[in-house]
Amino acid sequence: MQILISDELLNGTVTNQFEIHLSSNIVSVKELIKMRVTKEIEAYNNRLPEYFNGLVAPTDAERTLNGFKLKSKQVIDAEKQVYVALDAFQKNGFFILVDNQQLEDLDEMVRLQSTSKISFVKLTPLIGG
């Protein structure tokens, strides 16, 4: 089953969309994050564009308006990015909505349909203090 993943801002503006393939309609939150991150890293590594527009910043990357700019064009380690993304989820760096219901635990099982709306909403830390 193909399912559409959207990156959204808090106001609902979609900033990125792509599809992933699921072999089952029931997945854990952890599996969903892993599949999403792996897909975006594979897409980046196949093209090596100037900017990486993914869920979490790769090592040695600078945040810019266009995404994360790596100091040199290089292949990103997908396994490492998955680990960083799972950690960010647990630390509320982003949250996931499936059909407008927030997912809260990595082990939570989710039943998806081809029409399910999956949104990853990245939280931007406040600057200052």
Language model segments and positions:
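Ubiquitin-like/PB1-type beta-grasp interaction modules and other compact soluble beta-rich domains
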Residues: 1-129
